[in-house]
Amino acid sequence: MDNKNKIGFIGAGIMGQGMVQNLLEAGHEVNVIAHRNRLPIDELVALGAKEMMSLFDMASCCNIFILCLPSSQAVMSVCNVLFSRALPKTLIIDCTTNELITVKELARQAKAARLRYVEAPLTGGQQQSREAMLGAIVGCDVEDFVMVSNILKPCCAHIERLGELGMGATTKLISNFLALGTATLVVEAMKAANNLGVDWKKFYKLAS
């Protein structure tokens, strides 16, 4: 690990809190910022994270950013500040599940600002985040992938580059379709089992 790296983590909530904990345990310097809920921030500061009072302060001292936000709109709002304040060559790893059009626009803006923007939407949930068992679906330039992998390694069990920027969002969408379709199929199978007089609890154990 490069001890000169200073990570700014934006979105230390349900998914992000576990990621920050794992980054801290791996020895990274992590800076966090509060939004609505202070509890995760207070807990992370107690573990060694540094709290920043504003995005402006964070942009002036961090050379790597990880975004884990609830929507593309939130990402655009944050990046409007970061892209205007961050130093050239700053690496921005966006773990948000974004719309493809958002990724393309952020990539364009980052290039104009001489920043390195990478998309890395995640698979898994809160428990996987805490256990460092997330999956990262990365879309980026080839030369950025090694550094991105090293940064995300403490948080993720699987990190795969699917191609250039945009492929992360595309692959995550397909992954969501697959998960939703599988869940629907399971529900329908259980309903059919119940309707046909099959003990669905025993059937579930057999099928699991």
Residue spans for each PLM region:
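Hydrophobic residues within alpha-helices
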Residues: 19-20, 106, 192
